[in-house]
């Protein structure tokens, strides 16, 4: 073991890389350092928060709460062109099996209790993506007496995806933003 490794110098880029590096020589150096650590010691040290958040971001299971035409755009994100399945984002039909709810479409006053009930059935930790202008703030039907002016009045929303209807690319970008948010949060309650 060299003197630099014994004092911990030179390991900052390897051990505490906070941002994802683009492909290139910097990323190659980080990967080489990690694989070298594995071959020397047989293990890699990481914090539990980072490990758990890595698992959560790599296996999001969204449940569609499709209320209107935005739900059709959501289906496009799962088709072969974008294929969210290859990123570990597998759609689920049951709230008990999902950890992300995508609210897409106009939420009416009559449907609001059902949305809250489904949200309450989801296991912790759970996240909500509001997709489209109608789910974000009422959209075209904002002034109607029967429309909730944003699903954030019923459930807490983590990511808003704008558009009428938003494209599949916009939804995928919203999912990536949710993954960033999950990476930033702590998993262990410290008191």
From Swiss-Prot:
Family from the record = Belongs to the complex I 20 kDa subunit family.
**N-terminal signal peptide:** none
Name the catalysed reactions.
a quinone + NADH + 5 H(+)(in) = a quinol + NAD(+) + 4 H(+)(out)
Q: Which UniProt keywords apply?
A: 4Fe-4S, Cell inner membrane, Cell membrane, Iron, Iron-sulfur, Membrane, Metal-binding, NAD, Quinone, Translocase, Transport, Ubiquinone
Q: What cellular-component terms does GO give this entry?
A: plasma membrane; respiratory chain complex I
Which InterPro entries does this entry report, sorted A to Z? NADH_UbQ_OxRdtase-like_20kDa (IPR006137), NADH_UQ_OxRdtase_20Kd_su (IPR006138)
Please state the Enzyme Commission number of this protein: 7.1.1.-
Q: Where does [4Fe-4S] cluster bind?
A: 69-70, 134, 164
Co-factor binding details: Binds 1 [4Fe-4S] cluster.
Q: What GO MF terms are annotated?
A: 4 iron, 4 sulfur cluster binding; iron ion binding; NADH dehydrogenase (ubiquinone) activity; NADH:ubiquinone reductase (non-electrogenic) activity; quinone binding
* Protein's name in the database: NADH-quinone oxidoreductase subunit B 2
Q: Which SUPFAM superfamilies match?
A: HydA/Nqo6-like (SSF56770)
Which cofactors must be present for this protein to function? [4Fe-4S] cluster
Q: Assembly and interactions? A: NDH-1 is composed of 14 different subunits. Subunits NuoB, C, D, E, F, and G constitute the peripheral sector of the complex.
Sequence intervals crossing the membrane: none
What topology does it adopt in the membrane? Peripheral membrane protein
């Amino acid at each position: 073991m060299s003197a630099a490794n014994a004092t911990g110098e030179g390991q900052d880029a390897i051990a505490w890389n906070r941002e994802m590096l683009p492909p290139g020589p910097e990323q190659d150096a980080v990967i080489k350092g990690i694989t070298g650590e594995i071959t020397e010691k047989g293990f890699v040290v990481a914090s539990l928060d980072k490990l758990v958040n890595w698992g959560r971001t790599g296996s999001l299971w969204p449940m569609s709460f499709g209320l209107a035409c935005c739900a059709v755009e959501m289906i496009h994100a799962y088709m072969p062109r974008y294929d969210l399945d290859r990123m570990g984002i597998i759609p689920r039909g049951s709230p008990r099996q999902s950890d992300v709810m995508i609210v897409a479409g106009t939420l009416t006053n009559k449907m609001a209790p059902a949305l809250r009930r489904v949200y309450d059935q989801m296991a912790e930790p759970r996240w909500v993506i509001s997709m489209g202008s109608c789910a974000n703030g009422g959209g075209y039907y904002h002034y109607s007496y029967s429309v909730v002016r944003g699903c954030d009045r019923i459930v807490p929303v983590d990511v808003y995806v704008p558009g009428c209807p938003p494209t599949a690319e916009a939804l995928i970008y919203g999912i990536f933003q949710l993954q960033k948010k999950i990476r930033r949060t702590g998993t262990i309650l410290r008191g």
